[in-house]
């Protein structure tokens, strides 16, 4: 089976094993939506009376949202748009756009859309753990009102513990995620069947005519309820983002064989319950269960929401690494938490920021209904952006007929924009929070990338071409000392400023000089056979270019060891690494970007992870040479 290819093939057993694993990672978010989605339609920000017509109409909307958005749009079409097996909106943006063309309209618009869509996922990353765990714990107040004052404190404690153990990784307990979610979806289905038996006529909601009549009858108020209906598909983007871990086939198998049937049965069961007793709209999910099963159900729901939250947190870690490697974010400390699974990482700065934001949301809103008012805006926006980007993939990568592309795009955007419009109505009720978070992250991304461009432009203007430098060196050879010097350079062609400064000040050079450039390609992974490009320049100089994918982390000492068969032999004890360290001076004289963004870039640059740690260099073998740069 090809682990990172566009199509995962293999035995039925392997596919089923990956499908089981996908249940524990991919479907946690969408799988826990029954806890609150139906309730919000009839007892939320824009509540509707639970009349039979309204119940059948809303249920029909839920059914067809799952079919059109998740089953058709994502499972059939969007999952085809992989970047060498990897999914997610940043991978999709990288697939569409070689960064060198980003200034060509409409390419620049696509880049900005992709970056904004990725930034919005950070807002979703704070809301999903908050609303999921809180909605699970709220089941306790149904058992007894005595628990009501403790719902928020219990939720906060669980979330704090969840974030505190992130540094340990999920290698040991991750194997349990799949079986727990299988049990969860089984319980969803059984509860749904129990509810359907109360009012079998609820199955009539399969007819989309009920959804149409609901809009005809309710008009504007019917449109408003779409914001609550959308909660059933908020995990749709996760299917695409996690494609690289499992492949298309296992994700599709898990959806059509397990997740979709369980969700439909449970939503039908909740609908049947409301047909039988409209007063149960306050908590239709938990009221499906018999009284004796309430406490076990709360425990299982809590485990399922913790697993869903873990998947979202891990997804934010992965997204951050992609952003760092694509030079959209300052360098941060990335910890590998598993020696076997390269995708299992931990980023402390992101973890603590998520924890603070999530706990603040739980304490501030105090209920999952309050959070539901803020939930969905970011995801709805991202889904619209994904639909637009996939349109260009259909045309430019798949070369589909323009009429077919236009037809599919119209269908997808009609549905997505309807949900987007309904969710925009939530902005005043808290929906501004994920939008503000996304805008802040987007500002960081574009400021960091633009700032690095300005620094590069400044340094290139003062740079000496490498051939000219080598000619001058041959004419006036300096004294050479034993050992190897590795000069890190972010640019391919000129001589590194650190090399020139070192030679000017110290008047000596090592016997071996390696000019090393680490490049990040617009693909998830670069194979070992394509990673290293080594060229002898003469006079003991080597030009070493190393390529990584945006899902990989660079390790320079390992690269140097891998260069030995190519003729570059280095001794770690006599190798010195020379790094440039720019001191940025924001100034209004250089009109690169607004002054406030220059100050923001300078602040981020000062506080980013040192190159020594990012490239895994031995600290006692590193020399840093400073340079002032006006931006």
UniProtKB/Swiss-Prot annotation:
Function: Transport of potassium into the cell. Likely operates as a K(+):H(+) symporter.
GO terms of molecular function: potassium ion transmembrane transporter activity; symporter activity
Name of this protein: Probable potassium transport system protein Kup 1
Organism: Geobacter sulfurreducens (strain ATCC 51573 / DSM 12127 / PCA)
The entry's keywords: Cell inner membrane, Cell membrane, Ion transport, Membrane, Potassium, Potassium transport, Symport, Transmembrane, Transmembrane helix, Transport
Biological process terms in GO annotation: potassium ion transport
Keyword Nucleotide-binding among UniProt keywords: no
Primary localisation category: membrane
Protein topology in the membrane: Multi-pass membrane protein
HAMAP family, A to Z: Kup
Transmembrane portions of the chain: 16-36, 58-78, 109-129, 145-165, 173-193, 219-239, 255-275, 288-308, 345-365, 370-390, 402-422, 427-447
Annotated compartments: Cell inner membrane
Record's catalysed reaction(s): K(+)(in) + H(+)(in) = K(+)(out) + H(+)(out)
InterPro entries linked to this entry: K+_transporter, K_trans_C, K_trans_N, Kup
GO cellular component, one term: membrane
Family per similarity comment: Belongs to the HAK/KUP transporter (TC 2.A.72) family.
Domain of life according to the entry: Bacteria
